């Protein structure tokens, strides 16, 4: 029950302006403001913005951060793509050594040590929320790090700061236009991916066109973020009560 990519608000349109992204002081101020607010929402101190869907951000996250033994939590279509990305990364970059794909309701049976636990906070395909607090407890128990697909949870759910790295898009719970994606984290990865578009550092250094207008669309929305978030929560509650009747 998250807002879909088709969401279009007055604030999205008002925020749009001609933007180039390099040597554009007006845009630089907007981007700094938006990224600072996004870091505050997620609780991370570093963020990368890029042009594309959340799946692109997640592929960069998987390719640059994951290594060693990886446990992926199976929840549905969204976790399937994390699994596919991890398999590809294991094949082509050789940093991931082993992958296990385990159903979300069988995690109590996992006792082995992993380098990374990967999963979706909210699995939109079946309307399932796996509390990030429980994933954090699992991470600590398995002595691992936590990577989260926050596509359907960012902006609407709490405690994303419990994850070591997250990936998400500019729409859905952030109420921006489609076309922007973000990776938030606290520590830079040690891995180095040579493919230009999958290299996290190339995006950090802004070596390619960024999601300029998606970011502009977030400027006005994030100023009223709590209002829009509350509206979604009320609608979710009403839909739940209606279905219970």
Segment roles from a protein language model:
Residues 65-80:
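Conserved PLP-anchoring active-site segment centered on the Schiff-base-forming lysine
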Residues 102-155:
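Active-site phosphate-binding strand-loop segment of PLP-dependent enzymes
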Residues 1-19:
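N-terminal amphipathic/basic leader segments beginning at the initiator methionine
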Residues 15-60, 64, 81-85, 234-243:
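Conserved N-terminal alpha-helix of the aminotransferase class I/II PLP-enzyme fold
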Residues 160-171:
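Conserved active-site segment immediately N-terminal to the catalytic lysine
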Residues 7, 171-240:
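Active-site C-terminal subdomain of aminotransferase-like
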Residues 87-95:
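Short helix-loop-beta junction
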């Amino acid at each position: 029950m998250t807002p879909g990519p088709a969401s279009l608000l007055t604030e999205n349109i008002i925020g749009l302006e001609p933007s180039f992204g390099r040597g554009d002081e007006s845009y630089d101020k907007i981007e700094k403001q938006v990224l600072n607010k996004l870091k505050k929402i997620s609780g991370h101190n570093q963020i990368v913005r890029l042009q594309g869907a959340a799946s692109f951000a997640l592929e960069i996250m998987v390719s640059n951060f994951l290594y060693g033994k990886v446990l992926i939590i199976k929840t549905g279509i969204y976790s399937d793509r994390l699994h596919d990305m991890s398999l590809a990364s294991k094949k082509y970059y050789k940093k991931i050594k082993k992958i296990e794909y385990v159903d979300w309701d069988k995690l109590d049976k996992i006792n082995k040590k992993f380098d990374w636990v990967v999963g979706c906070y909210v699995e939109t395909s079946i309307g399932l929320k796996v509390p990030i607090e429980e994933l954090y407890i699992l991470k600590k128990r398995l002595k691992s790090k936590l990577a989260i697909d926050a596509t359907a949870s960012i902006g609407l759910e709490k405690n994303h700061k419990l994850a070591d790295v997250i990936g998400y898009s500019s729409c859905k719970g952030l109420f921006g236009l489609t076309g922007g994606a973000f990776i938030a984290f606290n520590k830079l990865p040690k891995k180095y991916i040579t493919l230009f578009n999958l290299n996290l550092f190339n995006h950090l250094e802004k070596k390619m066109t960024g999601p300029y207008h998606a970011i502009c669309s977030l400027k006005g929305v994030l100023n009223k973020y709590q209002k829009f978030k509350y509206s979604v929560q009320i609608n979710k509650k009403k839909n739940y009560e209606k279905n219970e009747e």
